[in-house]
Amino acid sequence: MEGFKLIKVLFATSEANPFIKTGGLGDVMGALPKELKRKGIDARVILPKYSAIKGELLDKLSFKKWFMVPVGWRNQYCGVYQCEYDEVIYYLLDSEFYFHRNGLYGEGDDGERFAFFDRAVLETLKEIDWCPDIIHCNDWQTGMIPVLHKLEYSKDPFYKNIKTVTSIHNLLFQGNFSADVLPELFGYDYEPVRNGSLEFYGGMSFMKGAINYSDRILTVSETYAKEIKTPYFGENLDGLLRERGYALKGIVNGIDYDEFNPSKDSLIAKNFSVKTIEDKVLNKLALQKELGLPINPDIPMISIVSRLTNQKGCDLIVNIANRLLQRNVQLVILGTGDYNYENHFKGLQELYPTKVSANIKFDNGLAHRIYASSDIFLMPSLFEPCGLGQLIALRYGAIPIVRETGGLKDTIHSYNKYTGIGNGFSFTNYNHNDLMHVIELALETYDDKEIWRSLIIQAMDSDNSWNKSAEKYKELYEELIK
């Protein structure tokens, strides 16, 4: 087509499903590029080649080339591997020194590891002779790519016309390090700290660099984009985000409808759809048997699939647990996190063995079965940039109870008993009594089977696929490269 330009986008990320993931970022990086590819964008992904990547995926990789990457005063080996998965090209950057570790994050040299990765991403482009129109960075781990590009690489004609975008998936994690990182790892003097563009409370911040130097800043929901411009949610970067508000936009995440599809999901006991909702209860019966809970199709099953942390509202749940368990309910928990919460939920199982199943682990198959079996899904987060759990719950007909924050506010529409419209229940104040009140309202509604069926239909009919969101990303890219 005359005048048609294929937009080339490189997603730089520290994790991507199916190769490796620790949370929502990995899910997004596995699904969004695939959807953009369907919309005619040449979307590719670059990430570290961690030793934890599964063997069957490693077997798909082909070695392209190697080169040395300057990290301050020294040079480090970088190998480039490539594979195609779901029609998307992935580049994995190999460095045994930096990425052959037990975990992805939390190492003492994380600053150096991702300083290497960020420069290696830019160096790789010239080495493989592929120049994207846009480098789309994600969270602090790729935050120095826009900085390196603006201060250094844009002077090279090869890189000159590249635009940079950064998505903030969670502003809480910022990549804050000593200011000595600049000369030690990037070969710069202290000027970016002195002029304030990277300075953060006496040190330097990868995230602040990304916010200052990216051409566009995105968050993963419209409400979170507004929230992070306020002191309560802004994590000491709210002033800068207000200043750069003209470049800030929120686009809500979707979920991968290929992976989360109750009508085809091989991980659940009985497939069902919005047309065969009556089959959903067979999953509940199978899960009750699997977890050793009393088998009863009528008892409301309430679930939590989450990291067990304050951010996820676990303190509220702990406060109401005994009151909740006086009722005729079953509570199923899956997740790991804060040691105190893990112990508390294990203690609840000992205290209420016929009502509580506490699974302190991560198990993807069990997560699917819990979503498919649950009647109610709890997600009372203190803050939630987007949240994927509530979207998966909707897909499987588990009615979410959420706090109105971030992406939860954007995706869950509280049930109105007068109009009959809604796909979940919500509350505003971060208060355990308010949470208990809305759970009681949901349980009261559950007793009316006709209304509850209508709620399930509205939940399952909610469109939370990547289709709409990917269209908004495409529009942003088109506007950026005009």
UniProtKB/Swiss-Prot annotation:
Gene3D superfamilies registered for this protein in UniProt: Glycogen Phosphorylase B
Known pathway: Glycan biosynthesis; glycogen biosynthesis
Protein residues bound to ADP-alpha-D-glucose: 21
SS bond list: none
Biological process (GO), any one: glycogen biosynthetic process
Keyword terms, alphabetized: Glycogen biosynthesis, Glycosyltransferase, Transferase
UniProt KW Transcription regulation keyword: no
Catalytic activity: [(1->4)-alpha-D-glucosyl](n) + ADP-alpha-D-glucose = [(1->4)-alpha-D-glucosyl](n+1) + ADP + H(+)
Stored SUPFAM superfamilies: UDP-Glycosyltransferase/glycogen phosphorylase
CDD domains cross-referenced by the UniProt entry: GT5_Glycogen_synthase_DULL1-like
Top class in the EC scheme: transferase
Enzyme Commission number(s) of this protein: 2.4.1.21
Gene Ontology molecular function, alphabetical: alpha-1,4-glucan glucosyltransferase (ADP-glucose donor) activity; alpha-1,4-glucan glucosyltransferase (UDP-glucose donor) activity
Task performed by this protein: Synthesizes alpha-1,4-glucan chains using ADP-glucose.
NCBIfam families named in the record: glgA, PRK00654.1-1
Family membership: Belongs to the glycosyltransferase 1 family. Bacterial/plant glycogen synthase subfamily.
Name of the protein: Glycogen synthase
Source species of the chain: Clostridium perfringens (strain 13 / Type A)
